[in-house]
Protein backbone atom coordinates (compact mmCIF):
# COMPACT_ATOMS: atom_id res chain seq x y z
CA UNK A 1 0.00 0.00 0.00
CA UNK A 2 1.54 3.27 -1.00
CA UNK A 3 1.40 6.08 1.46
CA UNK A 4 1.69 9.74 0.72
CA UNK A 5 2.99 12.32 3.11
CA UNK A 6 3.37 16.00 2.59
CA UNK A 7 4.61 18.63 4.91
CA UNK A 8 5.02 22.33 4.66
CA UNK A 9 8.29 23.78 5.89
CA UNK A 10 9.12 27.45 6.14
CA UNK A 11 11.55 27.08 3.16
CA UNK A 12 9.17 25.30 0.79
CA UNK A 13 7.30 22.04 0.48
CA UNK A 14 8.07 18.42 -0.27
CA UNK A 15 6.13 15.36 -1.25
CA UNK A 16 7.09 11.67 -1.07
CA UNK A 17 5.61 8.23 -1.62
CA UNK A 18 6.83 4.67 -1.05
CA UNK A 19 5.55 1.16 -1.74
CA UNK A 20 7.14 -2.22 -1.09
CA UNK A 21 5.89 -5.80 -1.20
CA UNK A 22 7.00 -8.85 0.78
CA UNK A 23 9.43 -10.19 -1.84
CA UNK A 24 11.50 -7.04 -2.35
CA UNK A 25 9.80 -5.12 -5.16
CA UNK A 26 9.58 -1.42 -4.35
CA UNK A 27 8.91 2.06 -5.69
CA UNK A 28 9.50 5.48 -4.16
CA UNK A 29 9.62 9.12 -5.10
CA UNK A 30 10.07 12.49 -3.47
CA UNK A 31 10.19 16.04 -4.64
CA UNK A 32 10.83 19.58 -3.47
CA UNK A 33 10.76 22.87 -5.26
CA UNK A 34 14.29 22.40 -6.71
CA UNK A 35 14.88 18.64 -6.93
CA UNK A 36 13.12 15.31 -7.22
CA UNK A 37 13.87 11.61 -7.34
CA UNK A 38 11.93 8.49 -8.33
CA UNK A 39 13.01 4.85 -8.43
CA UNK A 40 11.52 1.40 -8.86
CA UNK A 41 13.29 -1.87 -8.14
CA UNK A 42 12.64 -5.58 -8.05
CA UNK A 43 13.71 -8.51 -5.90
CA UNK A 44 16.44 -9.43 -8.41
CA UNK A 45 18.25 -6.12 -7.80
CA UNK A 46 17.21 -4.38 -11.03
CA UNK A 47 16.62 -0.65 -10.65
CA UNK A 48 15.26 2.13 -12.84
CA UNK A 49 14.90 5.74 -11.85
CA UNK A 50 15.64 9.39 -12.34
CA UNK A 51 16.52 12.51 -10.41
CA UNK A 52 16.48 16.23 -11.17
CA UNK A 53 18.35 19.13 -9.66
CA UNK A 54 17.73 22.81 -10.36
CA UNK A 55 20.08 25.46 -8.96
CA UNK A 56 18.96 28.98 -8.02
CA UNK A 57 20.91 30.41 -10.99
CA UNK A 58 18.85 28.33 -13.46
CA UNK A 59 21.25 25.45 -14.09
CA UNK A 60 19.35 22.18 -14.27
CA UNK A 61 20.21 18.50 -14.62
CA UNK A 62 18.03 15.45 -15.16
CA UNK A 63 19.54 11.96 -14.93
CA UNK A 64 17.62 8.87 -16.04
CA UNK A 65 19.29 5.60 -15.07
CA UNK A 66 18.97 1.83 -15.25
CA UNK A 67 20.95 -0.68 -13.17
CA UNK A 68 20.57 -4.37 -14.02
CA UNK A 69 22.58 -7.41 -15.07
CA UNK A 70 24.05 -5.38 -17.96
CA UNK A 71 25.48 -2.79 -15.54
CA UNK A 72 24.69 0.84 -14.74
CA UNK A 73 23.64 3.13 -17.58
CA UNK A 74 22.70 6.78 -17.28
CA UNK A 75 21.40 9.47 -19.61
CA UNK A 76 22.12 13.04 -18.52
CA UNK A 77 20.25 16.10 -19.81
CA UNK A 78 21.53 19.45 -18.62
CA UNK A 79 21.94 23.11 -19.48
CA UNK A 80 25.14 23.48 -17.46
CA UNK A 81 27.96 25.52 -19.08
CA UNK A 82 30.43 23.53 -21.17
CA UNK A 83 28.08 20.63 -21.86
CA UNK A 84 26.45 21.80 -25.10
CA UNK A 85 27.25 19.85 -28.27
CA UNK A 86 29.68 21.71 -30.48
CA UNK A 87 32.11 21.15 -33.32
CA UNK A 88 35.26 19.44 -32.08
CA UNK A 89 38.41 21.50 -32.01
CA UNK A 90 40.64 20.98 -35.01
CA UNK A 91 44.04 19.66 -34.15
CA UNK A 92 47.02 19.91 -36.46
CA UNK A 93 49.08 16.75 -36.77
CA UNK A 94 52.69 17.85 -36.80
CA UNK A 95 54.52 14.54 -36.71
CA UNK A 96 54.50 11.64 -39.17
CA UNK A 97 52.87 8.40 -38.20
CA UNK A 98 55.27 5.78 -36.95
CA UNK A 99 53.89 2.27 -36.77
CA UNK A 100 54.28 0.50 -33.44
CA UNK A 101 57.46 -1.47 -33.03
CA UNK A 102 57.04 -5.16 -32.35
CA UNK A 103 58.66 -6.30 -29.13
CA UNK A 104 61.98 -8.04 -29.61
CA UNK A 105 62.08 -11.53 -28.18
CA UNK A 106 65.44 -12.46 -26.70
CA UNK A 107 67.33 -15.01 -28.77
CA UNK A 108 67.58 -18.31 -26.99
CA UNK A 109 70.50 -20.51 -27.99
CA UNK A 110 70.08 -24.25 -28.03
CA UNK A 111 71.90 -25.91 -25.16
CA UNK A 112 75.35 -27.16 -26.04
CA UNK A 113 75.43 -30.91 -26.38
CA UNK A 114 77.96 -32.72 -24.28
CA UNK A 115 80.44 -34.87 -26.18
CA UNK A 116 79.75 -38.58 -26.05
CA UNK A 117 81.77 -40.22 -23.31
CA UNK A 118 84.90 -41.93 -24.54
CA UNK A 119 85.30 -45.58 -23.79
CA UNK A 120 88.14 -46.03 -21.37
CA UNK A 121 91.10 -48.10 -22.42
CA UNK A 122 91.55 -51.27 -20.43
CA UNK A 123 93.29 -50.55 -17.19
CA UNK A 124 96.64 -52.08 -16.36
CA UNK A 125 96.40 -54.13 -13.20
CA UNK A 126 100.11 -54.94 -12.73
CA UNK A 127 103.57 -54.87 -14.34
CA UNK A 128 106.10 -57.61 -14.11
CA UNK A 129 109.69 -58.13 -15.11
CA UNK A 130 109.09 -61.73 -16.07
CA UNK A 131 108.57 -62.53 -19.73
CA UNK A 132 105.22 -64.05 -20.42
CA UNK A 133 103.78 -63.13 -17.06
CA UNK A 134 100.23 -61.90 -16.95
CA UNK A 135 98.87 -63.47 -20.12
CA UNK A 136 95.08 -63.66 -19.95
CA UNK A 137 93.52 -67.00 -19.35
CA UNK A 138 93.40 -68.98 -22.57
CA UNK A 139 96.23 -67.05 -24.25
CA UNK A 140 99.68 -68.57 -24.84
CA UNK A 141 102.44 -67.78 -22.46
CA UNK A 142 104.03 -64.44 -23.33
CA UNK A 143 100.90 -63.03 -24.98
CA UNK A 144 101.03 -60.11 -22.59
CA UNK A 145 104.55 -59.17 -23.66
CA UNK A 146 104.94 -55.39 -23.91
CA UNK A 147 108.66 -55.15 -24.45
CA UNK A 148 111.61 -57.38 -23.79
CA UNK A 149 111.71 -57.88 -20.08
CA UNK A 150 108.25 -56.32 -19.35
CA UNK A 151 104.76 -57.79 -19.36
CA UNK A 152 101.41 -56.40 -18.28
CA UNK A 153 98.03 -57.77 -17.25
CA UNK A 154 94.87 -56.32 -18.84
CA UNK A 155 91.66 -55.98 -16.87
CA UNK A 156 88.58 -55.95 -19.14
From Swiss-Prot:
<dbReference type="Pfam" id="PF00379">
    <property type="entry name" value="Chitin_bind_4"/>
</dbReference>
<feature type="domain" description="Chitin-binding type R&amp;R">
    <location>
        <begin position="23"/>
        <end position="84"/>
    </location>
</feature>
<dbReference type="InterPro" id="IPR031311">
    <property type="entry name" value="CHIT_BIND_RR_consensus"/>
</dbReference>
<dbReference type="InterPro" id="IPR000618">
    <property type="entry name" value="Insect_cuticle"/>
</dbReference>
<dbReference type="GO" id="GO:0008010">
    <property type="term" value="F:structural constituent of chitin-based larval cuticle"/>
</dbReference>
<keyword id="KW-0193">Cuticle</keyword>
<protein>
    <recommendedName>
        <fullName>Adult-specific rigid cuticular protein 15.5</fullName>
    </recommendedName>
</protein>
<comment type="function">
    <text>Component of the rigid cuticle of the spider.</text>
</comment>
<dbReference type="InterPro" id="IPR050468">
    <property type="entry name" value="Cuticle_Struct_Prot"/>
</dbReference>
<dbReference type="GO" id="GO:0062129">
    <property type="term" value="C:chitin-based extracellular matrix"/>
</dbReference>
Amino acid sequence: NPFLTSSVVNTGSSISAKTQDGIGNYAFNYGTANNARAEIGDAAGNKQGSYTITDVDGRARRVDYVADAAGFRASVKTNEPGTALSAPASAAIVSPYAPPVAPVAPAVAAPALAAAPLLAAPGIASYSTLIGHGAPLGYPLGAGLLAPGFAKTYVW
